């Protein structure tokens, strides 16, 4: 396979560290630079726990893109920074794979239009774990037969956004096969505000944040005399790397924006 030159934004995070290791062990990936505002001017190998890769680190993406030739930007930063980076990447005509979440429908629509206009491949993935993507697809299928559903997502206590992008994407897919319906008793009253979680078109999403967790989600469907639960668990961040690898390889052949890995797997 042809070499793919990659820039990683956010190499010091746990996902970023795993992505650097992915670069090291994948023959056709070449890590040409990284973006980290705290370590501009250093090299990847200078960071604690990193492999002996000598890709330069830039403090900001603007400077990096001015000085480095790359094929793909892999962004694993924060929602706020990720939005800035994908916008800049599209403007510069650089393909990007975005692992941050928190995009609004309006922001996605604008990015989709811009990527189409520039004919630049872009993938925004709420979850890179292939198992999680299948969980979402299975939930979408089940919603055709089970109209009563709630979502519980559980993550580590350092996660910045709630509900998770995976939960939001799951509900979006379920809504495609489910009539609008308020889940629970029509006259129910919350004795404590927020007790029933977030509400999206009648579907409740419950977010749990605890140390010891990584990324977990279960989608619970109820029916007469039966329950169906679709669950996925990521026990470490290596579980996301197969999806990262697939996304980097796939985005090379795209000329538009794709939201969600379910749209690039068979």
Curated annotation (Swiss-Prot):
It catalyses: (S)-2,3,4,5-tetrahydrodipicolinate + NAD(+) + H2O = (2S,4S)-4-hydroxy-2,3,4,5-tetrahydrodipicolinate + NADH + H(+); (S)-2,3,4,5-tetrahydrodipicolinate + NADP(+) + H2O = (2S,4S)-4-hydroxy-2,3,4,5-tetrahydrodipicolinate + NADPH + H(+). NAD(+) binds at residues 10-15, 99-101, 125-128. Keywords: Amino-acid biosynthesis, Cytoplasm, Diaminopimelate biosynthesis, Lysine biosynthesis, NAD, NADP, Oxidoreductase. CDD domains: DHDPR_N. PANTHER family: 4-HYDROXY-TETRAHYDRODIPICOLINATE REDUCTASE 1, CHLOROPLASTIC-RELATED (PTHR20836:SF0), DIHYDRODIPICOLINATE REDUCTASE (PTHR20836). Catalyzes the conversion of 4-hydroxy-tetrahydrodipicolinate (HTPA) to tetrahydrodipicolinate. This is 4-hydroxy-tetrahydrodipicolinate reductase. It comes from Bacillus cereus (strain B4264). The lineage of its organism: Bacteria, Bacillati, Bacillota, Bacilli, Bacillales.
């Amino acid at each position: 396979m042809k070499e793919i030159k990659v820039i990683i934004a956010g190499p010091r995070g746990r996902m970023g560290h795993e992505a650097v290791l992915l670069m090291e062990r994948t023959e056709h990936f070449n890590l040409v630079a990284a973006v980290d505002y705290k370590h501009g001017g250093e090299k990847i190998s200078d960071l604690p726990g990193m492999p002996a890769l000598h890709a330069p680190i830039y403090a900001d993406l603007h400077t990096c893109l001015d000085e480095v030739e790359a094929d793909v930007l892999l962004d694993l930063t924060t929602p706020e920074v990720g939005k800035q980076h994908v916008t800049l990447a599209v403007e510069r005509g650089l393909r990007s794979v975005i692992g941050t979440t928190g995009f609004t429908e309006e922001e996605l629509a604008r990015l989709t239009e811009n990527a189409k206009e520039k004919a630049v491949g872009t993938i925004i993935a709420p979850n890179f774990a292939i198992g999680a993507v299948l969980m979402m697809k299975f939930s979408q299928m089940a919603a055709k037969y089970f109209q009563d559903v709630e979502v519980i997502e559980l993550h580590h206590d350092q996660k910045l956004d709630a509900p998770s992008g995976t939960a939001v994407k799951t509900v979006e897919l379920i809504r495609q096969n489910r009539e609008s319906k308020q889940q629970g008793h029509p006259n129910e009253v919350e004795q404590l505000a927020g007790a029933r979680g977030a509400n999206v078109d009648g579907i409740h999403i419950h977010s749990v944040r605890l140390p010891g967790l990584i990324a977990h989600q279960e989608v619970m469907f109820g029916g007469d005399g039966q329950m169906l639960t679709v669950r996925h668990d990521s026990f470490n961040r290596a579980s996301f790397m197969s999806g990262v690898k697939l996304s980097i390889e796939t985005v090379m052949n795209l000329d538009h924006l794709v939201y969600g890995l379910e749209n690039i797997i068979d």
